Amino acid sequence: MSAQKETLGFQTEVKQLLKLMIHSLYSNKEIFLRELISNASDAADKLRFEGLAKPELFENDPELKIRIAFDKDARTITIADNGIGMSRDEVVSHIGTIAKSGTKSFFEQLSGDEKKDAHLIGQFGVGFYSAFIVADKVTLTTRRAGEAEAVRWESHGEGEYTLESVEKAERGTEIVLHLKEGEDELLNDWKLKGIIRKYSDHISIPIEMKKGNSYGENGEVIVSDEMEAVNSASALWTRSKNDISEEQYQEFYKHVAHDFTAPLAWSHARVEGRQEYTELLYIPSRAPFDLYDRERKQGVKLYVRRVFIMEDTEKLMPHYLRFVRGVIDSNDLPLNVSREILQESKDIDAIRAGCVKKVLGLLEDLSANQPEKYAEFWKEFGQVLKEGVGEDFANKERIAKLLRFVSTASEDAEPTVSLADYIGRMKEGQDKIYYITADTLAAAKNSPHLEVFKKKGVEVLLLTDRVDEWVTGSLFEFDGKALQSVAKGALDLGALEDEADKEAQKQVEEASKPVVEKVQKALGDKVKEVRATARLVESPACLVAGEHDMSAHLERMLKAAGQKIEGSKPTLEINPEHVLVKRLAEESDEARAGDLAAVLYDQALLAEGGKLEDPASFVKRINKLMLELSV
């Protein structure tokens, strides 16, 4: 076997990550051992899975374990496993590069704030690189199960690493950390065992260390090379809830989610009946940096009778719950289950439906009993949960109850208003839930469409998330009350208007016919129609979409996304009581009337967040009218 050594350079992103990580995570340096043990555990899971089809991969060594050792004289710590191991190509792809979607987004989000960056780095999954927090040289020797050749990887964590082919009798991976100056406290039996019990007690295979020295009856030191398991070595989710501490639940979450922060909440249950399975599902406290990446994988691991099968399968959790982390362990699925089988499996459908109910129940409990925690959840994951209104018809009503919004009754910009809250505050005679969609909260609050609602003291929901158009396109009513956009269709306040209001509006419409016709003629085919309205109090005009047309806000979003759409023409509603409209009605000069009508239209377009087709002409008209007024 050739032992020729090859020197290669790290991918640029790896160099950046190493530098950032060593600086940002040093205050929590103990996590290096958790991360390396977690990787070793994953390698054991992969061997178990591949060994189902190829038992020969176990090479007559079926007892999977992780071993930790230290050498005070050499100042090294060794982490060894007999899991699946890696081939030469796998070493290069897993360690020399970061082959992750969202890498660019990750680096863009780094702020320079040490605490925030540490959280982001933790989310990204530092894994193997965490070794360089405490080591100035790392030597990794690995042989993939079933292969003859082993490979040794070595680096000082700077710009380069070396690779060479070596001999290795046992399959699996051995990592030797050559500690930096000042890290000698880690070369201690008690210290390492404490770290293992703190962070990795839940790992389902034994993590072994030497028993350590003991003392005889006469005080003599008895040196023992016997190995002992430091951890409990049982799958945490198989234990009774009463036997698991809150800290153990949190540490297991950090292992399974590769997250540094404690979870917000979790659900642990054993389900019996037609399907028998155990679920341990977590709601994270922070959103990952790539939450909105549609290609991002899901975060729930599937086990069958405690044998890891796969992760990141959308069949286990719907896309709108992609933030959920945890494990599902089935007693009934076959061990040789594949992604193809999952696509057709009614058993998996039943498990998924049950787990979705558990997660929604967990969120319902938070919203009812821990509103402050639920507010934290909503801030991080609210926009994603909203996707479920359109994706999950069976649970639409449950999801709708969990939605939170800002409204005209809100004291600040925090979305705390539920649809049930809104209905509880509805005016006598009100039969609709009114809302407006806009690009920003300021644009929504100051929209001319709200003026009559403010006048009558009617609450309006202010929807500014991009996903809100999807929500209102799927949720047509809640608790028997229709959802109605205040910027679409003719104004219908129902019983909120008395007969006197309706009669007065009829008279205004009749009296306004000449000015309506004048504006219609001036604007031509720019608008579907012009009409007098009672929805305006302070503004001269506003644009309204047809009842069944796409909203102007959605139109803008689709165009910004590069979609070619034929937008429908809006209706221009004018306020006959406004001084500008009265001035236009009195204007006898056709050209000036045309300028005034065009300005009314452009102002209405700007007020709803639209973009002028010809800004220069708008400026000229405004300048011209201002000069005439100053004469």
Curated annotation (Swiss-Prot):
It is found in: Cytoplasm. Residues 340-556 are annotated as: B. InterPro entries: HATPase_C_sf, Heat_shock_protein_90_CS, HSP90_C, Hsp90_fam, Hsp90_N, Ribosomal_Su5_D2-typ_SF. One of its GO terms (molecular function) is unfolded protein binding. Keywords: ATP-binding, Chaperone, Cytoplasm, Nucleotide-binding, Stress response. Its main location: cytoplasm. Residues 1-339 are annotated as: A. CDD domains: HATPase_Hsp90-like. Molecular chaperone. Has ATPase activity. Belongs to the heat shock protein 90 family. Homodimer. This is Chaperone protein HtpG.
